[in-house]
Structures are given as structure tokens and as C-alpha cells.
Amino acid sequence: MIPLSIRVPASTANVGPGFDSVGIALSLYLHVVVKEKADKWQVIHSFEDSIPTDDKNLIVSTACKVCPSLSPYIIEVTSNIPLTRGLGSSASAIVAGIELANQLGKLNLTTDQRVQIATNFEGHPDNVAASILGGTVIGALDGKNVSVVRIESKELGVISLIPNEELNTDESRSVLPDVFPFHEAVKASAISNVLVAALCQKKWKVVGEMMERDHFHEPYRLELVPLLPSIRKCAKEFGAYGTALSGAGPSIFILTPYEKRQEIAEQLARVFTSMKVCELEIDHRGITVNKEEHIGL
């Protein structure tokens, strides 16, 4: 019997000025394999000790909130998505938990329902929608209702610079202002509008320009990620379209011409030796489920 397995891609959020709205799925993955029924939930993993191995695990707790009547199982979790680095590790766990409930609880959730539920858990649609749908997503949460549009960006290459230091999302959000002046909001939203239009029309140079002109969050987070300006300068010199914080940071996200991504990554690795330079691709499939013959679980 082939066990039920779920694969969820990582994601980057914001892409500069698309704050809490624009997300892109990336080729790093969280894998969940359902082993067998058990008396209580057990999560097998090789992560740090602080990651729970019982029903307090984020994947399991999410699944149980979605389907409270869910029977416990032993599951095995592996992932190459770095934790607390701005690459959607918690969002991928939430998405995996929803799908775990969907499959084991036979809920038959639609894609729209999964996006809505995931957004309710996460508080914004960018990361979770990208992990569910793949590709590039633009989303909006208006009260309780979420709207998401997905677009293709297959001509783009992706590079991520990942530091050794963690940065908690709550800490990164704590430096943001509680109040945003009206004229600043108008300017910031106009830049975000052009970013989205350029993404839709595949005007990559304009995308690169707009993603480096954010006013919503990056100016306030520079103190937490001081290398961003120098990485941005070098990446542009090496031929990248644009550079931005990946989500809340501390990882840096770079968009490049697809055919130049390896060359640019190698050049950046020679300069920024204290960071892990990853040449990635945009994941266009989103969450995938191997559910062959798992009915007997």
C-alpha cells in the first residue's frame, strides 16, 4: 500500500511593496507522510527539539482544528525549508495541516475553501495561497473574505540569500508603524499597483524597479537586515531584475532572468560568504497529494 503523502512548497511574500498580498511559491518543500493509525498523534521529525512531536505540532493542531473528529495517526515530516527565515515555513505547515484534515477526514474541500481556511489561520493570503496554488499570487483579505488571483512567471529565476541567524516574524513586525500617513499610503500603494501590473504583463525590468521601491515595510526593517542595500546593489550589477526582503526576513529574495540565475548566484556567493546562496525555481504546481490506495488508512 502506498501511504498518503503531501508535499507543500515554500514561499516568499511581499516581493517588495506587495505587503501581505503578493506571494511566490518556491522549490523548497515540506513533506508529510501518513504512516498508520495510533492511539495518539505522533510526529516523527529530525528538526530541533522545540518542534513538538505530538498534537501541539502546528501541522497536527491545524488539522484537528479543521476536522475536530480526526482520528490520530503517526506522521513523518521532512523539510528543506529553513525555519524562521522568511520562506513560509509556518505557512507550509498550516497548508499541510489543512490538507491532512481534508484527506483523512474526507472533507472534499475546494481549492477556494482551502485558501480561505489557510488565510484565516495565517492572517494574510500571500504565503499560504502561493503554497496551495503554486506560481505567483496576488491576494486580498477584506475582513473574513479572501480573493486571490494566480499568474504564471515561468521566465523568472529566483535566488535566495539565507543568513545563519533566525528572525522571528513577530519581532520583524514589531518595528512596523501602527499608523501610516495618508500621502505615504498613496505613494506606497501606487508602487504596489505598478508591481502587480508589471507582473501580469511580464515587464520584468519594471517588476525589478518596483520591488526595490517599497515604503510599507522595508525601510523599517533595514535595522534588522542591514545587508539588504549592499546585496541589492551587487545583484543589480550582476544582472538581476530586483531584490527584496523575503517575507519578514531575514532571507533576501532576488528575481533574475531564468537563464542567468546560476551565474548571478555564483557571483553573489563569492561576495556574501556568510550567507547561504540558493539558486531556486518558482514552483508552478503548488501543493501535491499522493493519495493512491490510501483509502485503507
From Swiss-Prot:
Report one GO cellular component. cytoplasm
The places in or outside the cell where this protein is found are: Cytoplasm
Which InterPro entries has this protein been placed in?
Answer: GHMP_kinase_C_dom, GHMP_kinase_C_sf, GHMP_kinase_N_dom, GHMP_knse_ATP-bd_CS, Homoserine_kinase, Ribosomal_Su5_D2-typ_SF, Ribsml_uS5_D2-typ_fold_subgr
Its GO biological process terms? threonine biosynthetic process
Q: What is this protein called?
A: Homoserine kinase
Please spell out the taxonomic lineage of the organism that makes this protein.
Bacteria, Bacillati, Bacillota, Bacilli, Bacillales
GO function term, MF aspect, one: ATP binding
Q: Which domain of life is it from?
A: Bacteria
A matching Pfam family? GHMP_kinases_N
- Reactions accelerated catalytically: L-homoserine + ATP = O-phospho-L-homoserine + ADP + H(+)
Q: Which UniProt keywords apply?
A: Amino-acid biosynthesis, ATP-binding, Cytoplasm, Kinase, Nucleotide-binding, Threonine biosynthesis, Transferase
Q: Where does ATP bind?
A: 82-92
Q: Which residues form a coiled coil?
A: none
- Name the pathway: Amino-acid biosynthesis; L-threonine biosynthesis; L-threonine from L-aspartate: step 4/5
Q: What class of enzyme is it?
A: transferase
